[in-house]
Every structure is written in structure tokens, then in C-alpha cells.
Amino acid sequence: MELPATKLRIGLVIFPLILLTIAPILYLFFGYPLYYSTSTYKHLSNSSSSSAISSPSRYNHSSSSSDSYKTEDSEPSSYDNDYDDTYHDPKSSSLHNNDRLSISSSNGHHQVTPKKEHRRKKRKRKCDIFSGEWIPNPKAPYYTNTTCRAIHEHQNCIKYGRPDLGFMKWRWKPKECDLPLFDPYEFLEIVRGTRMAFVGDSVSRNHVQSLICLLSRVEHPEGDSQQEFNFQRWKYKTYNFTIATFWTTHLVRAEETETGPTGPNSFYNLYLDEPDPTWASQIGEFDYIIISSGQWFFRPLFLFDKQKRIGCLYCYIPGVRNVGAHFAYRRALRTTFKTILGLENFKGEVFLRTFAPSHFEGGEWDKGGNCLKTRPYRSNETELDGMNLETHSIQLDEFRIANRDKNRNDGLNLRLLDVTQMMLLRPDGHPSRFGHKREDKVILYNDCVHWCLPGPIDSWNDFLLDMLKNRDLKRLKY
């Protein structure tokens, strides 16, 4: 009988030792994952609900260039989309950006829904009105070359026999919302008692003519016939509203040289640190300023800074540094913004209208190039590249810098009227050879730079009105 008792005593001693040996191993394989999964669930559930509350503070309103808009307004808009409290930043993968959180554990794959998700309130988010497609609009156009007398001859495509009329029957549709068509009555009420200046080259003038034509359904303005169109003012007496144009080729001071070739290949002296006085001396009296430029920077230039020549473009003169067109363009934009930001007591709104690409095919403008398309591109059929891409990038960069520096003038508001992508899709919207008589001898025989009226440029005023109605909106990221 002693043998079993001896075995029992030995077993009572050895069994606890075995348990002490394997217990840590069992804990590592089973106990710790269970504890980790439970504690992580509690932590994520708590942090998710707090993140959803605090996430609006992550919005950056001061830096502006992205493809999204955001507002705290509770009032719905015709082009709002619902979304939850979490800001869905495509560049961020933080946990609070997910509606459902995925956690792996030893027990399998758990889908964890943050606490109080059902209590989240819907907010309204403004979409990017500049990202979209052209869609058919059988109701267009809203004026003709007979109802509007402001159309420049070179953009009067119907008068000069353009055979296809489909280019007029499109409207811009943003991807995630709707863009209301231009309402001339609403526009004139918003700008009642104000002044609006367009500063730029002939494409800026093209924009002004489009606006005047759209407003002609309400009122024809009184213009000073003694003034050259490039520096003209139009007065809408009923609304006490004035439109003015300031012609400037480069935004900064430019002088055509007396030596060298003449015509479109003539040289200009460009003073990169001096704004063009034709607009800089008068612009402070306006409430709205729309600035634009671009086409004139791709021609022969001598560049000056502080009255000293620092280089040239397309000059090929021994001993003179040949720089790129975009160097001059960047400096000119920076000087322009610096001038406007430095205006004393100016509290208006300044719009940078971005570059509208030309569409020459088969050669350059002076080498037989033409634009014969009759339909818009889809957004997946073409892309911005080369000089157009670099020009647009410079505009975004300089706008961002100016927006950062505008705190010196608290009342001034900078806005980006980004038409580049939507106009890239409209190779069919140019006059081509239908801006003059066939036998006329003109410098730009096939015009693939300017835009027919009526035509796609009318949508720029859809944007302008929408932005005037929504002054509190900022582009979120650049």
C-alpha cells in the first residue's frame, strides 16, 4: 500500500511544477491576445466617438487649393452632398477616417463599429465645382450674336459662317454636385452698387464680353464710346454696377523694343518687379478684381529686375542668359499679388482666373496649326501636360503663397477661379478660321486661343456667380 501513496506524493509535487512551466506559454498563446483584443476594442470605441466630434477642427481654411470645398453652414444647397462628421481626406489613413474599424485577434477577424455612430449628424459638404464633365444642354445658348452687340468680331463665329452649332449646346457638370446656370438677375443683385475689374489680355476681354452678353437679358450697359475697348467701362445704371477692363499683356510693366523683328515676334522688355501702371494705378477703387494672363509669356522677352537686365527668353544673344518662360511668369504673378496685397484699405475680392489652354493641332499658331474638333473631350480622353501643366502649377503655387501672406490685409479675400481643366476639354470651342472673312489677312488666321461667343467661356460666369454667392467657401488643399 505504500507504493501508491508514494506515487501520489510525487504527483502532488510534480504537477504544480508542470503547471508553473507551461502557464506562461499558455498565456502567450491565448490569454494575452484576448486581453489585447478586448482593451483595443474599448480604446477604439472611445477614441472613435471623440474623433468624430473633434474632426472638424482639422479643416484648413487658410490654405486653399484642393478638389474639395467645405462649409459649416447648415443651410442646404442645390449642389450639396451629405457626409458624416469624419473628414475623408484621401491622403490620410488615420483610424477616425473609417466608418468601420478592422481588428485582427486570435479569435478571428472582428469588424468593430465605433460607438454612437447612429448619433452622428449629417453635414453638408461643398464639392469641387471645377472637377467634372461637359454634358449636353439643348436649351443653350442664352444669347446670340444678334441679341448681344458686345461680341468681338474675331469671336463672332456664327457671323463668319461656322457650320456646326453643337459647340454652343453644352454645360459644365461637376462630378459630385450641380452647378446652377448663370442667372443675370441674381448676379446683378449681388453686385449692386459695386465695381468689377478684369485685368489681363485678350482672353480676359473675351470673358468680359461673355459676361456683358449674359447680362444683356436684363439690361444693356452704357459704355464710354470714346475709350478704347481694352480700357473701357460699362455702367449698369439700374444696379449702379460698373465693369471695367484693363488691358495688360504681362501684368507687369512691358515695353516693346524698337530694335529687332516686328509683329508677333517682336521683343518686349519685361520689368519683373514693377506692376503694369495701367491697372496698378487704378485698381484700388474696385470691389472685385479678376486677374489672368499667360499667352504673352511664350514669346521673345528681355527680363529686367531693379532696372538691370537679368536674362532673356528666345533671344539667343551671346553673353545674355536664356531663361525659361515660366521663370518670368512666376515672377510676374508674384509682383501682381504683392501689389494687390499692398493696397491700402483695400477690402475687396480678388480672383485669379487660371490658364485656359489653346488647342493647336498639326502645327504651331504660325505654322498652319488648327483646331477642327466639333465635340468636347471626356475627362479620361486627355490630360494636362507640358507647358500647360507647368503654367497651371505656377498659378496654384503663387496663389497659395499670396493666400498665406494676405494676413497683412485682413479684409481682402483671394479666390481661385480654376478653369484650366474644364477648358482643356473644349477643343471645339475656338473660332478657328471663323473669326474673320476668308480673304482677310490677319496674324492669327486659325484662332485656337480665344473662344467663340456664345460658347464654353460662358461657363466661367456660372463659376463666378456661384463663388460670389458662397463667399465663405475655401478650397481646402493645394
Swiss-Prot record:
Q: Where are the transmembrane segments?
A: 10-30
Any single GO CC term annotated in Swiss-Prot or TrEMBL for this entry: membrane
Low complexity bias: start-end ranges? 50-68
> What GO molecular function annotation could you give as one example from this UniProt entry?
O-acetyltransferase activity
Cell compartments where the protein resides: Membrane
Region Disordered, annotated ranges: 50-125
Q: What does this protein do?
A: May act as a bridging protein that binds pectin and other cell wall polysaccharides. Probably involved in maintaining esterification of pectins. May be involved in the specific O-acetylation of cell wall polymers.
What is the protein named? Protein trichome birefringence-like 20
Which species is this record about?
Answer: Arabidopsis thaliana (Mouse-ear cress)
**Gene name for this UniProt entry:** TBL20
